[in-house]
């Protein structure tokens, strides 16, 4: 049985990724590591230099705990996760959004990227392949609504923001916490919706167990 470490910078990421594992890889043994000080220290600007070492430390702890694969669920820390992956090779270490990006880009169309945390949009657009037709949108107030448990306001703000992306061919949801609106987006707009948890679980399963 594969043991998978899920590393979180916020508790809101835990329910959607655990649901994705139950649906797509129920036999995996998952362990959760939560350090919400990462989110508190992230801010909306550039990543603080000391942040990378903190991620490497978390990754090494997960590896020492017997993890066969590691998935970071925090989308605003791409360079830190890349450094951790290099440090722990050959253990598979995945960013939360890399599989979703590959799937969304495979369509060849214009991608509407929805995010609720400003820090995500300082790093994530650069992770898309050069030449990608990308239209990012920050949904102000939605993440704060989610944190206080106001799911309806969160969902309504996301759906309203998506109206500005009607010229896009697909929607890409930048954060795990946005996966809760995937079905609502498809129902309203009829466009493909790429969600980070499901894409990440499929990719990590292949990386850990091989194809099949």
Give the residues covered by each predicted segment.
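Non-catalytic structural scaffold of enzyme domains
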Residues: 1-212
